[in-house]
A protein has these predicted regions:
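Catalytic cores of the polymerase beta-like nucleotidyltransferase superfamily
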Residues: 1-134
């Protein structure tokens, strides 16, 4: 059983704000593992179907980071939460070529997907653990 008191109030508020804006939001990865083990997570990561630009619009105290693999850091005075958009595992076009931008850079890491696609593209470790906070 997960002790809700060990979940960051800030992470909960981010997920609730995503939900209010009609987006999904889940705790993901190591923080879920720690919670399942009864430990206090060191940090919290969130996965969502909102694009980085949509996350940035919702949270004024945030910044988009990364060129190849875009993420959003949402922060307050004491915490920084990393918010990642669900990604698709698809990195090929229908004819089998890698998807590239106009400059020739491979853009497979920024192809948005859904929860199922995001789960399948992650390695089968703690990175594929998702926790819904719908009842918190």
């Amino acid at each position: 059983m997960i002790n809700n008191k060990k979940i960051s109030k800030f992470a909960i508020s981010i997920i609730k704000d995503l939900n209010k804006n009609n987006f999904e939001g889940y705790l993901v990865g190591g923080c879920v593992r720690d919670l399942l083990c009864g430990l206090e997570p060191k940090d919290f990561d969130i996965a969502t179907n909102a694009t980085p630009e949509q996350v940035r619009k919702i949270f004024k105290a945030s910044r988009i980071i990364g060129k190849r693999f875009k993420l959003v850091h949402v922060f307050n005075r004491s915490e920084l939460i990393e918010v990642a958009t669900f990604r698709s595992g698809q990195d090929l076009t229908n004819n089998g070529h890698l998807i590239k931008d106009q400059s020739g850079k491979i853009i497979r890491d920024n192809i948005w997907g859904n929860l199922d696609e995001d789960t399948y593209r992650r390695d089968f470790t703690v990175n594929a653990l998702y926790l819904s906070l719908i009842h918190i």
